[in-house]
Swiss-Prot record:
Protein's cellular compartments: Cell membrane
Gene Ontology biological-process annotations: detection of chemical stimulus involved in sensory perception of smell
Statement: the UniProt record of this protein carries the keyword Glycoprotein: yes
PANTHER family documented for this protein: OLFACTORY RECEPTOR
Name under which the protein is recorded: Putative olfactory receptor 10D4
Principal subcellular localisation of the protein: membrane
Residue positions the entry lists as glycosylated: N3
Encoding gene per record: OR10D4P
PROSITE patterns associated with the record: G_PROTEIN_RECEP_F1_2
Amino acid sequence: MRNHTMVTEFILLGIPETEGLETALLFLFSSFYLCTLLGNVLILTAIISSTRLHTPMYFFLGNLSIFDLGFSSTTVPKMLFYLSGNSHAISYAGCVSQLFFYHFLGCTECFLYTVMACDRFVAICFPLRYTVIMNHRVCFMLATGTWMIGCVHAMILTPLTFQLPYCGPNKVGYYFCDIPAVLPLACKDTSLAQRVGFTNVGLLSLICFFLILVSYTCIGISISKIRSAEGRQRAFSTCSAHLTAILCAYGPVIVIYLQPNPSALLGSIIQILNNLVTPMLNPLIYSLRNKDVKSDQP
């Protein structure tokens, strides 16, 4: 990646229309972040320490906990730093790093949810062959594939964004460095980067959405064939948690990246939901309501 820029740092403007609320936001977001760290560490510890939880479903839940820890830590610590009265400045390299890991982990999230939908599809539609199909090798390959796709995605968008010259304005209208906020600061035509970013994010989101839709269509057909009401309820409750998490994850992507001109305030609120609230809720949605995990927590 070549550096054409005279800009050595960017200024994160933070959340629009929140002047005077810094102390309240610092307390609120610090509480959310602490709950995110504690909840996901507890879930990860329970899954690793209990042999009863060494199953495909909990293997992917463990990956989700690792993702949530990393995803929230990409943007939240810097936000808490300047909300506490410190500088809003972020170095050029820090901005590059933040954007890379945000898209790396964000893409990984989409494909991880897709893999988890496929796992539920096999568990409900082929229960007798579940352990044979979702063996250790398959699970490892699927998990590794999600992280690799996320890495390639970020390695495409990050150089494309920062190969442009940044020679003047350096105020980022977000609370972290992301493509919609950074690209307008470039001193050169950004149409190519915008088209590639839109196509990349949109295509990957559609692929994941299509695979999830197919999986849950098959799951719905299988559930409708279950004769006992208790069996249908159990299968549905297993899938409802995953569907809830998918809605929380895909909503921000659709609003932020597939709208031509999202408002700064709306964008910030949705990004906070995606970056901070969803990782905090995932342990509750997926695991803390699960009796197996509850019984194995330290």
